[in-house]
């Protein structure tokens, strides 16, 4: 199973799961799944994690500092089809109209978006789609704070890639009973 995790899920793991993991079992399980490639962290997600809550993710999950285990996204080149998706499905056209964004400004926004962890999660998911990847995020489909590009769950739906939250991943895919890990 290829599970690609975003920064919000890493932060949720650190904030809401680790404090109850008195025995270290849960952290050890997460580390094992990361080291054997079941949990994938993109280089862009790692870089973003450095700046979230004073680097708490990297402090608590020190094993993810091994850059050899990260997926390098520099070779991910968006295809013509991806650009079409970006312009037509991933984009919130109502917001573009509402903000009066010009074509030049929209091109700049696309360029900025393509450099984000979110866009790279989608690109990488498409590149390994034959392996049925799962994207893990704590984002929801609703309310996007007037951002031009839709959130990860909505975009995953557009490209037919499974997307779930951390609790769903643990329960349904990893078959983990969290209550047994916190003792």
Regions found by a protein language model. Give the residues of each.
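Active-site-proximal, substrate-binding regions of enzyme catalytic domains
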Residues: 7-133, 141-142
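Acidic, PIN/NYN-like endoribonuclease modules and their adjacent C-terminal/linker elements
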Residues: 130-132, 141-183
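Extreme N-terminal starter segment of soluble prokaryotic enzymes
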Residues: 1-3
């Amino acid at each position: 199973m290829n599970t690609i995790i975003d920064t919000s899920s890493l932060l949720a793991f650190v904030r809401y799961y680790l404090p109850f993991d008195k025995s270290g079992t849960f952290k050890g399980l997460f580390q094992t799944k990361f080291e054997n490639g079941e949990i994938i962290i993109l280089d862009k997600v790692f870089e973003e994690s450095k700046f979230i809550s004073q680097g708490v993710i990297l402090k608590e999950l020190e094993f993810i500092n091994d850059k050899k285990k990260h997926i390098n996204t520099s070779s991910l080149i968006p295809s013509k089809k991806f650009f079409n998706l970006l312009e037509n499905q991933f984009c919130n056209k109502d917001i573009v109209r509402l903000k009066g964004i010009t074509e030049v400004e929209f091109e700049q926004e696309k360029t900025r978006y393509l450099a984000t962890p979110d866009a790279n999660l989608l690109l990488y998911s498409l590149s390994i789609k034959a392996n049925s990847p799962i994207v893990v995020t704590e984002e929801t489909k609703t309310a996007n704070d007037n951002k031009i590009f839709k959130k990860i769950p909505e975009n995953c739906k557009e490209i037919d890639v499974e997307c779930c939250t951390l609790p769903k991943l643990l329960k349904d895919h990893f078959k983990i009973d969290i209550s047994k890990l916190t003792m």
